[in-house]
Regions:
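Extended ligand-binding groove/face enriched in aromatic
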Residues: 97-202, 206-213
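Short coil/turn linking the two alpha-helices of tandem helical-hairpin repeats
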Residues: 86, 90, 139-143, 200-204, ...
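CBM-like carbohydrate-recognition segments
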Residues: 26-81, 85-126, 161, 184, ...
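Oxyanion-binding "anion nests"
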Residues: 250-263, 267-284
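Residue-level detector of extended alpha-helical repeat arrays and alpha-solenoid scaffolds
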Residues: 75, 128-131, 148, 189, ...
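Active-site cradle of extracellular carbohydrate-active enzymes
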Residues: 189, 196-200, 208-259
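Bacterial Sec-dependent N-terminal signal peptides
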Residues: 5-37
Length: 386
């Protein structure tokens, strides 16, 4: 079934007439992979090599030599892997689950390694948004209301207040730093919409759904290309700049998908599917997501894991056409097979490190936590898809 047919079957007129990605010939692994065991190994490697277990926060390099001063927003994605593991094992391994719950408490006590404030506020809007999303996941996993309260307070006081109307239209500004406040970025608006949607999910306050729609409408009408499904990086001085990145494709998919679930408007689903198709067909080489980083010690090494997180939710949604879901699941599975069998040297466990290029193992230079988080996110996703 083509993507056009899949959407037409939902009674949608405005369809995407693109080619579906077909990874079916790439699904054979060189050996049988136990994804739960693989995820356990990836989680332990992340925690043992990169976490300060007295603080629950993560250091940039495995040997502790890197400067952690600006190591903030990635903390959210690293803790998300711990939450993934917690949710997977809490009913079967109470002792380890309790340890992971303690790490969440410590992470919160130290404000996710926030380098500029005793709370979660930050000059960069997207940095706070990722922290808020992780706090909400911690609340969802544990029921600890303090996490939700901090998430709500941070969003209400320091995120949605950065919505401005200027020559770029609306949109959340990227940063309050001088010279950066004129930039409206996909990286601040995609996660911003997700924050509002998740707060609506757990508070049922209509203002959050209204704000999510507002943020998403700006993003969709400016940086999103409805013909291709690509999401540009930013708009500055009324001019669109920068090409698509897996970070922005992923958060656009996530916010569109959640809006579809909350409203039933199939336009959101169409846009989510288009964005996913663009990633699979135009941002991959031989079926493997492109490496968007020039080095392992780069925030770009986190980007692929962001796409994986939100594409996984889309692939798991049983209300969406089964052929599309299989396509997306197979794409991620192919990436995971190559990453786990070719892109990591497991001979020195737990000193095993993912590379930012999932097709080749790391070298000693690559012992940074950003690619480790993306790799572990991918492997954890396999435990949900299989």
């Amino acid at each position: 079934m083509t993507a056009a047919a899949a959407l037409a079957s939902c009674g949608v007129d405005d369809v995407y007439y693109g080619e579906m990605y077909d990874p079916s010939s790439l699904m054979d692994a060189p050996y049988q992979i136990d994804w739960d065991a693989a995820a356990d190994s990836a989680d332990v490697a992340l925690i043992d090599n990169f976490m300060d277990k007295d603080r629950g926060t993560f250091q940039l390099s495995a040997d502790g030599s890197a400067n952690n001063q600006f190591n903030y927003w990635g903390q959210a994605h690293a803790m998300d892997v711990v939450i993934d593991a917690y949710l997977r094992i809490k009913d079967t391994d109470a002792e380890r689950a309790a340890t992971y719950e303690k790490y969440m408490e410590l992470w919160h006590q130290h404000r996710g390694n926030n380098y500029s404030s005793p709370d979660y506020r930050n000059d960069f809007t997207d940095d706070m948004e990722w922290i808020v999303l992780t706090l909400i996941r911690m609340y969802e996993a544990t029921g600890e209301k303090d996490y939700l309260d901090y998430a709500k307070d941070t969003y209400d006081q320091h995120i949605i207040t950065r919505w401005t109307v200027d020559e770029n239209g609306g949109g959340l500004i990227w940063s309050i730093e001088s010279g950066r406040e004129i930039s409206k970025n996909a990286c601040s608006n995609g996660p911003g919409a997700l924050c509002a949607l998740r707060l609506y999910e757990f508070t049922q306050e209509e203002k959050y759904l209204d704000q999510a729609k507002m943020i998403y409408e700006w993003l969709s009408s400016t940086l999103y290309d409805s013909e291709t499904g690509s999401v540009a990086d930013n708009m500055k001085n009324g001019v669109i700049n920068g090409g698509a990145l897996s970070y922005n494709q992923g958060t656009f998919i996530g916010s569109a998908h959640m809006l579809y679930n909350f409203t039933g408007d199939k336009r959101y689903l169409i846009e989510a599917m288009r964005a996913a198709e663009y990633q699979m067909n135009n941002m991959s080489t031989d079926g493997i997501m492109n490496s968007e980083a020039s080095s392992a010690n780069s925030d770009n090494s986190l980007f692929k894991g962001i796409f994986i997180r939100y594409a996984t939710l889309l692939a798991l949604d049983e209300n969406i056409d089964a052929s599309f879901r299989k396509e997306l699941s197979d794409f991620m599975t192919h990436n995971a097979i190559v990453c786990w069998t070719q892109g990591i040297d497991k001979s020195s466990y737990p000193a095993i490190f993912f590379n930012y290029d999932w097709t080749v193992p790391y070298t000693d230079y690559y012992k940074y936590y950003q690619p480790q988080v993306s790799g572990a996110t991918l492997i954890e996703a396999m435990t949900r898809l299989h």
